[in-house]
Amino acid sequence: RDMLDDPDDLAILDGVLGLSSAFRREAIAEGVETLAHGEILLKLGCNLGQGYVIARPMPAAAIPAWLAAWRPDPSWLDQTPISRDDLPILFTWVEHRAWVAKVVGFVQGERNTPPPLQHQQCRFGLWLGHDARLRKDDHFTIKALEPLHIEIHALASELIALKLAGRSDAAMAQLTELHRLRDSLLAKLLSMLQ
């Protein structure tokens, strides 16, 4: 369930899917709660799932009518599994979401300490500085990621400084901008997986 925000959960899921493949079995994902969960599972090659975004619990007698009416979300159609070479991009996507969530948690008073703020030292920055450079076919996307990543870290540093200075309201007022920048960066990353 936390695979969208916890790199360790995504690693566990990847391992379970690898085991199911090794034993020639199909895994059924439990807890598919959002469209994003479904998209990531499909990218990992998991085509079977159950959860609230697919169907709420129902009596057995209601299943035939549900089967006749259910259609997958358009965002799930034509999804193809990513290659093993592209897994670092997916992990980077999750790690960046998790990092922003930690910044937001600190600003909102849900965490006692902020995450590391140096843009070169976060997992995304490390990927961008090394593994991303090896991807020749994504050169223009990667070039667009660098300034956006730096801008996100600069804003996060500003928000944390405001919070530490006792100006939580000013920091909270800028969370929408942090989310906008995050969403832009994540969309660029996902475009590399198409």
Task: List each model region and its residues.
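Bacterial c-di-GMP phosphodiesterase catalytic domain signature
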Residues: R1-R24, A36-I40
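Cyclic nucleotide signaling catalytic output domains
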Residues: E26-A69
